[in-house]
């Protein structure tokens, strides 16, 4: 991984060492316990003075500038991502609910599909989704390829099926030529899923101001943003939101320190979360922790879209995940830090 640059290390060193050490140890222990004693990331090398601590999760690190992907697959996947012929009535594409210029979501409480069908959860961002350890809020898809399967067949999303999709795309000479160039068997459901997933893996958003800070530019963040990052760690947010994607690498129960669903009301089957997949009572109300990359652009928040603003989402997390009220200044500084996580897509600021 990329080590933190010397300027950032000096900023960390300016904080009391005992506090830094304590925070890292507590965050590591909490993250370990919440994952059932199993880590999903390996220990890594930290800069002094943290190297000797060897925490069980990777330090937050900048996104890579690019990944090594097949350019032809990326280009073909991009075309299909915006192709409405993947839907029953040629009205909905992947891009309908995952608007790349809007943070990879549609900024709706619920997405609307074919014939006005309304989904049961808030659409998660597609940006940086290749770094998630599973896909969907409930983690029912183990890969991006498996994720592509869901919307195509879902009656409230694209409401199609693969024979129909293959029939429509097979009549497109340009698609036929492009697939034949890449695959001996041409246009198949498996190959469509492969190119779309490859395109989705290319949707990384590096060069946020926070990335630049991690790379050594201590001036990339303002004083409130630096304080917000410090609070993000001291409050324990980093126990779940860490790694290169600041999330996306574990499940967590919604409402650790309070009954979120009883207070919100109108509980639905989708609120069961991971339980709907594995039917394990211990997984009730567990969801994949979302990435915080570009989070300022992806309102409304949570699987239910119930928080309209970033500040509201932070307050909800403080109450139901941490069991405490957060002073307004702390909340605002954490929000300022989170807004520094907005990056670039294909070299253009989001």
Question: In which residue ranges do the predicted regions lie?
Answer:
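Post-cleavage N-terminal segment of exported redox proteins
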Residues: 2-74, 132, 150-226, 230, ...
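Short glycine/threonine-rich turn/loop motifs
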Residues: 39-150, 211-316, 322-324, 349-350
């Amino acid at each position: 991984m990329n080590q933190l640059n010397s300027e950032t290390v000096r900023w960390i060193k300016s904080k009391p060492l005992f506090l830094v050490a304590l925070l890292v140890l507590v965050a590591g222990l909490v993250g370990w316990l919440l994952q059932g004693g199993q880590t999903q990331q390996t220990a890594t090398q930290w800069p002094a003075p943290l190297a000797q601590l060897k925490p069980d999760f990777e330090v937050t690190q900048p996104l890579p500038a690019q990944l090594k992907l097949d350019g032809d697959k990326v280009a073909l996947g991009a075309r299909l991502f915006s192709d409405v012929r993947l839907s029953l009535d040629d009205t909905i594409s992947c891009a309908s609910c995952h608007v790349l210029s809007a943070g990879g979501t549609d900024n709706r409480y619920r997405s609307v599909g074919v014939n006005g069908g309304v989904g049961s959860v808030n659409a998660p961002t597609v940006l940086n989704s290749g770094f998630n350890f599973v896909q969907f809020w409930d983690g029912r898809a183990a890969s991006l390829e498996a994720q592509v399967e869901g919307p195509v067949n879902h009656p409230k999303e694209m409401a199609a099926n693969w024979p129909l999709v293959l029939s429509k795309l097979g009549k497109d000479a340009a698609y036929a030529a492009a697939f034949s160039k890449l695959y001996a068997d041409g246009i198949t459901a498996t190959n469509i899923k492969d190119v779309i997933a490859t395109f989705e893996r290319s949707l990384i958003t590096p060069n946020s101001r926070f990335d630049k800070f991690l790379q050594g530019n201590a001036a990339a963040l303002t004083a409130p943003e630096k304080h917000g990052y410090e609070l993000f760690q001291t409050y324990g947010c980093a126990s779940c939101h860490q790694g290169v994607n600041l999330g996306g690498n574990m499940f967590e129960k919604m409402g650790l320190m309070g009954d979120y669903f009883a207070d919100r009301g109108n509980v639905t089957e989708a609120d069961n979360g991971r339980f709907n997949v594995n039917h394990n009572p211990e997984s009730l109300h567990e969801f994949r922790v979302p990435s915080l990359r570009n989070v300022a652009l992806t309102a409304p928040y949570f699987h239910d879209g119930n928080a309209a603003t970033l500040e509201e989402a932070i307050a909800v997390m403080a109450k139901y995940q941490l069991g405490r009220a957060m002073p307004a200044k702390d909340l605002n500084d954490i929000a300022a830090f989170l807004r520094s996580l907005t990056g670039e897509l294909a070299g253009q600021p989001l």
